Amino acid sequence: GVGNFDPAIRSIRDYTAMQFKDFVQDKIPVLGICLGMEMFFAKSEEGKEKGLDVLGGEVVLLPNNMKIPHMGWNSLDIKKESKILDGVDNGSWVYFVHSYRVKPLDEQIVVANADYGISVPAVVENGIYFGTQFHPEKSGKVGSLMIRNFLRVCKK
């Protein structure tokens, strides 16, 4: 959800002596929402702490010529099939509150973008890792469907 990169990363590291990757062991599906998704990456311009680095890439500030934070509804441009986007129509509207965007090393993990003057990766999926830059919990029926889809993945 909403927060700052460094305190969020420290809270995970302080929670357990195990490394995050060792804890989930490529078996436990993980959904990162907004900051949670950003924490999947190696580093963020927002802080000095190392990210979880389960998805290669970095997190960068939205360009300063844009209104920051990006707050409000925006539509999804779905690029490929995704387990959490099952049944979600291309062009569906979702709710964003963010100042940063992810820059994955592997663009293939981006399954949907949003247009905010630039293309913003809105949904990423790679193995057990699922991330949304927007807030599905604030995105009405579409967001509820995505959360149900994720829970279905968890049941398998």
Label every model-predicted segment.
Residues 2-72:
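Cysteine-nucleophile active-site neighborhood
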Residues 17-21, 85, 147:
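Short amphipathic alpha-helical segments and helix-helix/interface helices
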Residues 34, 98, 135:
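Histidine-centered divalent metal-coordination motifs
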Residues 42-118:
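Pocket-forming structural segment of enzyme catalytic cores
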Residues 91, 125-129:
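Beta-strand-turn-beta hairpins that frame and shape the catalytic cleft
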Residues 118-125:
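Short, surface-exposed beta-strand/loop micro-motifs that present aromatic residues
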Residues 132-156:
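Acyltransferase
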